[in-house]
Structure formats: C-alpha cells, structure tokens
Curated annotation (Swiss-Prot):
Keywords of this entry: Nitrogen fixation
Keyword check for Plastid: no
Organism of this sequence: Klebsiella pneumoniae
This protein's record includes keyword Transmembrane helix: no
Designated name of the protein: Protein NifX
GO biological process: nitrogen fixation
Protein family according to the UniProt entry: Belongs to the NifX/NifY family.
Pfam families, per the entry: Nitro_FeMo-Co
UniProt xrefs under SUPFAM superfamilies: Nitrogenase accessory factor-like
InterPro entries in the record: Di-Nase_FeMo-co_biosynth, DiNase_FeMo-co_biosyn_sf, NifX-like, NifX/NifY_domain
Amino acid sequence: MPPINRQFDMVHSDEWSMKVAFASSDYRHVDQHFGATPRLVVYGVKADRVTLIRVVDFSVENGHQTEKIARRIHALEDCVTLFCVAIGDAVFRQLLQVGVRAERVPADTTIVGLLQEIQLYWYDKGQRKNQRQRDPERFTRLLQEQEWHGDPDPRR
C-alpha cells in the first residue's frame, strides 16, 4: 500500500469537537469525487471560530483499489462530515460505519461558504436551545392554549 504523500497537521486537533473535511484540489472549493481526490482539507469548527487542522495529500491512483479508499477513510477518522462532489454508495456506507456522514455538494462549492453555513446552523441551534431553557412554563401554556378534541376512549 503506497503511503500518503504528505500530511500537515496545523494545530492540536483534540480541542475541536467538530471536524469537517472537504475533497478539494485547490484548498478553496469542493471539486472532487471522494475516491479520486488528491487532497482532503480538514477544519475544526466551533460556534465562534474555524481553524484549518490538517491537509492530507494522496498519490493519484486510478481505479477502485481497496487500499486507496482505506487511506482516505482513515484520514477522516475524527471527522463528523465529509463534503465532496460525488461518492460511491459502498464507500458512503463505509464512512457511516466509522461515524462520518458524507454530503454531496455541487462542484465548485466554496469551502468558506460551507463553513459559514455550519457555524450559522450551530448558532441558530444554540439560540433555539437557549430560548427553550429560558421558558420553563412553555409546556403549561401550550396545554392551556390548545383544547383536546380527541375521543378520550379509543375503543368506542
């Protein structure tokens, strides 16, 4: 099995609870099929910041060699999501087995745009959670606002 050409670890990645990877040839766009990508770019994402954690460059290999896919999957072990242009169904399932969700996106989708969407979703989710936590009486009010119109005895 030929080794990975290069791997650059930028920061200690254990402090990042969310790591996402991008199949990219130019560091800026998602533009590659997962099985053929020459590079995976991995970012750590938090609600308030994003940091490049790792870049993994692969040897260009044609075909569907098992080792080629295994190296790419291994490079994603600590990631939660992979963004790519395309991925085979069998490899998609293999990624799910190691806890990585693959997302297909249109060619030339910007990595910055996807990172911003992830942060926005994270922020919105946090805001909704905070609103629920601030209103402990919400269920009581909901029950008072709505009447029960169902038959209390379903056997009738």
